[in-house]
Amino acid sequence: MLEVKQLTKTYDGGKRSLQDVSFTAQPGEVTVIIGPSGAGKTTLLRSINQLITDDSGQIRFDDQDICALNKRDLKHIRSKIGMIFQNYNLIESLTTIENVLHGGLARKSTIAGVLSLYTKQEKEEAIQLIDEVGLKDFAFQYCSDLSGGQKQRVGIARSLMQHPEMILCDEPIASLDPKSTIIVMDILKKLAKKRGMLVLINLHQVDIAKEYADHIIGLNDGHIVFDGPADQASSQDIERIYRDSAFATS
């Protein structure tokens, strides 16, 4: 379980991106964060993985407060958290299987990683994951030759190579066409349901969120304005989530 308690983040210049954000997300469920641009969605995901530090609050995962960990322990817990990025974050000059194998680098020695010394078992696992995301025929194709949807699926397979317990997805379908969007969201839903993973996704598309999410969190101006089952998010709730300056002060 992921438990966020009273998380607050203020950037230089006094811009407060998150204000007393609290929620829980469960394994085996897709939790989707929605809200207007600048609501704090990306800041929240980056905080959970401690890519940025917060002013106050707790982020509890795997029975630990991520915010309070030293560098060594933080590196260990990050190995349990996969990241899917809007811009794919692949090495395009490498093949699909090479990119996927890089997902397991945290388990290898520095020398083995630098020299790309992968075992037969690791290569077989990478092929299995590539097949799982529907790209077996593209395993040895350079990622520069893949479509956006295919690249995002490579990113998912690479994340799975990490053996994560939680996957954080920052706008994973923002650049995809409708067909690729469905394929990627189906894969993420399957990870939650069949692998029992905790999947946390930032989205702009409300219709996709309501179709695929078990749990929706609505952010506006750094505040949570909705937190509940997806099927209970009414049109009034959605309107409030996307209302301009819901927490503006004079």
Feature annotation, model-predicted:
Residues 178-180:
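Helix N-cap at the start of a conserved alpha-helix in ABC-type nucleotide-binding domains
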Residues 203-204:
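H-loop/switch region of ABC-family ATPase nucleotide-binding domains
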Residues 49:
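Helix-to-loop junction immediately C-terminal to a conserved catalytic motif
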Residues 167-170:
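Catalytic Walker B motif of ABC-type/P-loop ATPase nucleotide-binding domains
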Residues 142-146, 150:
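Conserved ABC ATPase signature
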Residues 65, 112-137:
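Conserved ABC ATPase "signature" region
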